[in-house]
Amino acid sequence: MRTKLLIQGCCMALTAITMQSCSGQSRPLNNNGHNLWLGNISVTKSAGKAAWQIECDNVDKKALGADEIGVDASGIYNKALGDEGFSINCIGRHVTVTANTDAARLYAMFYLKRMADCGERIEDKFLVTEIPAFRYRILNHWDNPNLTVERGYAGKSLWKWEELPGKIRPEYEEYARANASIGINGTVLNNVNADARMLSREYLEKVKVLADIFRPYGIKVYLSLNFAAPKHLAGLKTSDPLDKDVIKWWNEKVAEIYGIIPDFGGFLVKANSEGQSGPQDYGRTHADGANMIADALKPFGGIVMWRAFVYAPESPDRAKQAVEEFKPLDSQFRDNVIIQIKNGPVDFQPREPFSPLFGQLENTNVMAEMQITQEYLGHSNHMVYLHPMWKECLDSDTYQNGKGSTVAAETMGKVHGNTSMGAIAGVTNIGDSVNWCGHHLAQANWYAFGRMAWNPDLSSEQILDEWLKQTFTSDRKFVEPVSEMMLASREACVKYEMPLGLHHCFSGAGHYGPGPWDRSSRPDWEPAYYHKAAADGIGFDRTSKTGTDAVSQYHEPLRSLYDNVETCPDNLILWFHHLPWDFKMKSGRTLWNELCYTFEEGIQEARGFIRTWESVEKYVDPYRYGQVHDKLVRQAKDALWWRDALMLYFQQFSKMEIPSDCSQPQHTLDELRSFRLRISNYETPALDKLPEYVLE
């Protein structure tokens, strides 16, 4: 008989340092990760020099193979390059940068720095032109005035509001420099579940300080707004978007903001979702609300990013609701409104099909919202390289205007000819942790988002190769195995958490770990709403004949592909179909065995990550090596925890055995259900507060 669930502790970091001292091998000096991929993140100050000029001095010209770097001083505006594009031309060993603005020159200098730091040399007659794919490349911070970060796993907020405007921390400019190095040009400073105080004069003066710091790096600031701000801040009786006093208040507030921050970017809005106020409170539409804000911003060039993350507890299928609410409003939004759509139709799950809303709006600007923070993928305890997930979404074809109407093309504005409103957003994984992201390898996701926003055609391999070389070493004996490990990590996470299209099977406690049995105050917050495990099978029936007909929100040929169980991809089959436990999969296995073996693959891959990391120990400083090792061990244990919880729970319905050639559960279902993880939505669990597992 098993004893009750144990708790495990970690001491790998100290072990790593001891191992280093006994091995006799020369290893890099300890590195706390604060410098990110920049080598030295500290900002060099030089009186009278623009940021691009300072970065030009930072380029290792010898490593690059250049004698000098100059800038085209003709003063002629190159229309083809626009305000952010640049070209680099090398004649002999002289490099010339052509760009129209200081921001574009800065991007060019970071391009050259990246080349040098990655060991690439510039050759005679080298010529490259770079123009960003998306006009708006924006980070979304879910930071609160009290310094908590919703779904934040890297400490507290980077923004110390209680110190501003008087005290300015060096991290603010370091943050701006890091973002400029990867092409980010905007940041939303506060949580979409917005505190109305962020629009008060007191806080606007604080925001101004950050805007002034970010401006030389080509970064504009944006704010999330509370739709009920007129009531909260001005004491109006209503926030009805068609009320003349409400309209007047917003016009005056926006004018006030631009008087303080002349290049303010605009607003991000979460309305009528998860308890947030919105225009529907007054019988108005999303378009009514968005347009009121857009009209106030229009004279100043600002934009509204209106989130499509809406769902109601009474709906039989949460995945359908964004299309149901927004498609009828197509063509009704102002031209400076962008509908911000999560990559999938539910909520940042390890794997979802792309949101069908991307292909349903023909005369409305749309943008993608990716989640860089790992809300459902192990927080900052798990190593999961997310670019393959995002690229899977962007490369997906909506078929809205026939073949080639990819999510990337839709959100860049190419499908409907409005590239001036192309936009993409990423919910950050940044906090005041010394390494910024809570996990040293999670920095790759911040880096990858920026590089993808600049050029979505870049491969996951290329971006990761760049990041590893700049952050650790360019030695191929390190880069190749670690790259292989990280490239496999997203698929491994899907396998050990929610394979074959399963989704929303997590614990409600901070969204960490499994909880397929969890109950909640709303049915659409309960895992059973999604997995629908029962004696007759498992999976959500979204087919046209027997289900919710969510497949009809996709254009052909996707509608038929997903609707037919014979053609539906295995990796989404339980997203679209409810199948019997003995259903024969394409592999020839029963569905039950396919689940068992897929979980097992994820478990073994997570264990393999530990071995890979141990094999490159000599290339990594002891500090980062030890911290990453601790977390990889926990990740492998969590993989077992996920498998045990889901398969033992589902076994109640299937009445089938876990195959003998799979690793067997280490805990009973009762033990797992009795475990209580007590964390908030603003933290990741400590490694010593999680279920004990033995790695064989």
Regions found by a protein language model. Name each.
Residues 405-696:
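Catalytic domains of carbohydrate-active enzymes that cleave complex glycans
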Residues 27-38, 79-268, 298, 385:
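Feature activates predominantly on carbohydrate-active enzymes
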Residues 1-10:
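Bacterial N-terminal signal peptides that target proteins for export
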Residues 17-27:
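Bacterial Sec-dependent signal peptides at the C-terminal "C-region" and cleavage site
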